[in-house]
Regions:
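Membrane-helix interface segments in multi-pass membrane proteins
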Residues: 39-80, 111-145
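Central hydrophobic cores of alpha-helical transmembrane segments
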Residues: 103-112
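Mid-length scaffold segments of soluble, non-membrane domains
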Residues: 79, 83-87
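Alpha-helical transmembrane segments of integral membrane proteins
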Residues: 24, 28, 32, 67-74, ...
Length: 161
């Protein structure tokens, strides 16, 4: 187990799911991953209107639209990298908690978050097919999983083997 979060982050401790960490290290690592995610998402909220491109009104190569999609490419890569790092961080913590199948439990939060993001993206484009209630249901599941993770791996200590 890493002695502190600084040691874990200093040797890039999110690169593998092997090992164990304590609740404090998990909380610090989650905040460490959550802050850039929040900043990148906030930037995307400001840039998202530029992704709407109507060729009847704007030229084919509108530089604002090109820059928006370049950022979207970077943002998508960052989202996937943060999800993988959080999976590795959580797998260590679930293993320390003594739950069976720590990899499956660690993957539940990133998977649900990615599905929620996809549903929020797809629903306005396919509103006739996908009701908003599906999106709300996925969001409710995401909130429940976040709450369960915060309580289970963020607050409780290690279980005795």
């Amino acid at each position: 187990m890493a002695g502190s979060f600084a040691e874990l982050a200093g040797r890039f401790g999110f690169r593998t799911d092997q090992g164990r960490i304590d609740a404090k290290t998990w909380r610090e690592g989650t905040i460490f991953l959550g802050v850039p995610l929040a900043v990148l998402t906030l930037i995307w909220f400001f840039l998202a209107p530029f992704a709407q491109h109507d060729l009847a009104k704007t030229p084919f190569l509108a530089w604002g639209t090109v820059a928006t999609f370049v950022y979207l490419l970077f943002y998508a890569f960052a989202i996937l990298l943060i999800a993988i790092c959080h999976y590795n961080l959580s797998a260590k913590r679930w293993r320390d908690r003594g739950w069976p199948f720590p990899g499956a439990l660690a993957g539940l939060l990133p998977l649900t978050a990615l599905v929620s993001g996809a549903a929020h993206w797809l629903q306005p484009r396919e509103a006739e097919i996908i009701s908003y209630w599906y999106v709300a249901g996925i969001d409710a599941a995401l909130v429940a999983i976040i709450a369960w993770n915060v309580v289970e791996v963020g607050c409780f200590g290690a279980r005795k083997p």
